[in-house]
Structure formats: structure tokens, C-alpha cells
Amino acid sequence: MLNADLKQQLKQLLELMEGNVEFVASLGSDDKSKELKELLTEISDMSPRLSLSEKSLKRTPSFSVNRPGEETGVTFAGIPLGHEFNSLVLAILQVSGRAPKEKQSIIDQIKNLEGSFHFETFISLTCQKCPDVVQALNLMSVINPNITHSMIDGAVFREESENIMAVPAVFLNGEEFGNGRMTIQDILSKLGSTADASEFENKEPYDVLIVGGGPASGSAAIYTARKGLRTGIVADRIGGQVNDTAGIENFITVKETTGSEFSSNLAAHIDQYDIDAMTGIRATDIEKTDEAIKVTLENGAVLESKTVIIATGAGWRKLNIPGEEQLINKGVAFCPHCDGPLFENKDVAVIGGGNSGVEAAIDLAGIVNHVTLFEFASELKADNVLQDRLRSLSNVDIKTNAKTTEVVGENHVTGIRYEDMSTGEEHLLNLDGIFVQIGLLPNTSWLKDAVELNERGEIVIDRNNNTNVPGIFAAGDVTDQKNKQIIISMGAGANAALNAFDYIIRN
């Protein structure tokens, strides 16, 4: 089931195992069970430290990743290929005794959790957000014997996942726990365990402190570190919104990559320099005093720096119409690559006629029964090549001059109301899912009145990435820079870094 290149890479990784690992599989006579047995046999034959046995488990087909004679609580229900293959490889290494790369403070938080925690995560193999959650919960299961975790492929267990309309969907002890991408710190926080502010008490002031973790942040950090400046990053996750991007084909010199691969490479590049990257935590306030610029974190800790570069990026913009908020993850979705497979053979709408919306409609047309694309303007704004491709599809309708007015449904989406602005007529379209692709909203709510914002909530900057507050710079999608592209954000981050360096020299 694995191609030659992947087998070679896997064989090298399996050499890092520090102890024996046993696959315990629950198999039936169905085709998926046969595929799973073939995969596990193929992997087991690649290392003398791996073995395979069979036992009836809660779900079939499924398998646990155990130590000989010891259950770890790590289970995969389905066949973990696609984006989840890395989750399987990591689970093998961690169960074998390979030390995780998490900070000791995080490991201690996991060990100190009290109670029994039985997690189940519904995923799709095309979901780019899912592996982060699966890998975090698997690691927690390996570290704490009171935690178990099962990854469940919704495409294999359709009856069980029938009402799951967004992935990853995490359940704890049978109750809904969370949806969407979560870091290990996010999960711990939801369980009531937060990073101690004392961890930050002894940090010396920075020359440059960068808030945010996307392309602009990474670029700025590398540039300032190369100038010999003491550099820190405060970020929820390295890569930012790029983590949720499926394919990247316009990053010059790299013909094709994925958002997750790009983010992984960015993190590795940051690690090559003396940069204090503090991830899994967010900033909540910023203040300039006579002594320093002070950034307050969500755990109450305060960091000081001579300069700050704000690069907090942007998140999905919502429709802000009745019914939308209540039905997010219940039919209202933002990631077609993640959640599209959950709507197989169903009718969906895509809201937005730009490149993102048209690309989403094209992708979904290959999965769902029918796509209706809504655009507020009189014509689509996407590139012509994308529009031509969209119009060639037989199961897509395009509605322009269409103002969406209400998401309809109680426990899940059943339809959408819209106004035909050319006639003033109201219409109801019955459907099962709505994918919102109307642009991004800058992550600036935490700034309050600290720096000048425009009417769209973007930070106002000049050509040198200065804000209206000396010493505070901004870069990337959080700013009023017109074009929002990865490569432009990276250039902006470098520009902000060089001007922060110049500011420090002159002040």
C-alpha cells in the first residue's frame, strides 16, 4: 500500500524506535479490514521491533498501538493514510519510548491531570487541521495512563459520524469537547490546566518581540536574529492561517507545497536561530511606557521589549447573518478541504466569488451532489482560468447579485435564504452545507486602542511598516497592506525587521 519512496523514508524513521511496539488489530471480513491488515503487515515487516496481533476492539476495523503487555490508549479506527500517516508514525515512535519534542512544562501539565479522560476524534483523511489534534491527544495518552484517544475516520464509520459536519470533532467521555484545530496547550487549557505565568518571570527584555506566528512573523524573526538582536515570538502556532491552506503553488522557487509542509519548514528555519519561540499562548494587551513596550499574555505574564512587530494575521470572515453563528460546525464551514468529504453526495453552497470561493466550489463539485455559488456583486471576481473551469462543471450553479440573508436550520443546516438584488425577490434554497469564503478578518481585537486601525480593523502602517506608535511595527495580513499573499507577508516581515533594527540603532 506504500510506494517505494514512502517505504524508504518510513524504514529510516523506524530505526529511531527505542523499544518494541505491538499493533493490536480488530479486523473483519470487509474490504477496509483487508486494507488495514495489509498496511499493518507491511509496516510490521519493516522493523524487528514491530509486531502484529489480533483482538476484538470497540470498532472494526481499528488497531491500537501498544507496548508489549501494556495498553497505551492510542487507537486508530480506520486506515491512517493521507494526512494521518504522520500521526501513525509519531505514535509508533512515542510509544516505543522516543522522547517527545514538547517542553518539559507541557509534559508536566499532562502528567498532573487528574481524572479519567477518554477522547474520540472524528477526522477525514483530507483534513489538514486534524493531524495536530490527533497527534496532541495521542501524545497525552502516551504520557498519562488515565488518558485514552481514538482517531475515527468518518468515511469508514459513516453511521457513527452521520451528524458530524466539521472536522476535527473531538468528544471527551462521550460529550462534545471541541471542533477545529487545537494545539496541545489549547486542549490543556480547556481541561483547566494553563501555563504558569512564573515560566515567563525571569525572561530578560527583548530587542524585538514579534506577536504572531505566520509568514510575516517568521520572516521578521529570522531577519532580526541574523542582525544579532535578542528576538522573541509569541504565537498560538507557527505557520498561522497558512496551516489551513491546502496547496501553495505561487511561492516562487517552490513549485508546489502544502500549508502544513510550509509551516513545518518555517518552524524548522526559525529553530536554526537563537529565537525564543513561545507557542501555544496569545497576547491580550500591549502598552508603550517610558521604559519599554510591554506585552501582556493570556496567563497574566508580561514581556518587555525595545520594539514590537505585530504580525497576528487574519481569520475567516463570517457572513454575520441570522443562523450562521449557531450552526457553525453544524453545516456552516470554512474549510472545504477539511470538511468537504463530510458532505459527499449532498447539496452545498459556497459563499464568495473570489479565487478562494471559486476554488472551493471546484473542489467540492468532485465530492458533493451539487454546488451553488453565491456572489454579492454582479460578476465573479476570481481569475478567468478558474471561472472557466467552474463553468465547465455540470453540477454547479452560479448566482450573482445574490445577498445571503439567513442560514436556516435548528440542529443542522437545512437551507439558506437569499435576496436576488436585481429583482428584490427572496428565495429559500434547501441544502445541507454552507462553505463561507468571503475573505479574512484581521486579528486586532486584542489591541483595543493601542495603535491606529482603519475601518476594516486593519493596522494602519507606512512604507516602513511603522504604526502610529514609535517602536511598534506591523506586518502581514493584519495590516492595511492591499494584497494578502504569503510571499508579500514574508517581504513585509523582513521590511519591518530591518526598520525595527534601524529604530533600535537610532534610539
Swiss-Prot record:
FAD binds at residues 207-222, 467-477. InterPro entries: AhpF_NTD_C, AhpF_NTD_N, Alkyl_hydroperoxide_Rdtase_suF, FAD/NAD-bd_sf, FAD/NAD-binding_dom, Ferredoxin-NADP_redctase_2, Pyr_nucl-diS_OxRdtase_2_AS, Thioredoxin-like_fold. Keywords: Disulfide bond, FAD, Flavoprotein, NAD, NADP, Oxidoreductase, Redox-active center. NAD(+) binds at residues 347-361. GO terms for molecular function: flavin adenine dinucleotide binding; NAD binding; NADH-dependent peroxiredoxin activity; oxidoreductase activity, acting on a sulfur group of donors, NAD(P) as acceptor. Its cofactor is FAD. Pfam families: Pyr_redox_2 (PF07992), Thioredoxin_3 (PF13192). GO terms for biological process: response to reactive oxygen species. Disulfide bonds join 335-338. Binds 1 FAD per subunit. Its EC number is 1.8.1.-. The active site is a redox-active disulfide bond. Belongs to the class-II pyridine nucleotide-disulfide oxidoreductase family. NCBIfam families: AhpF (TIGR03140). This is Alkyl hydroperoxide reductase subunit F. It comes from Staphylococcus aureus (strain MRSA252).
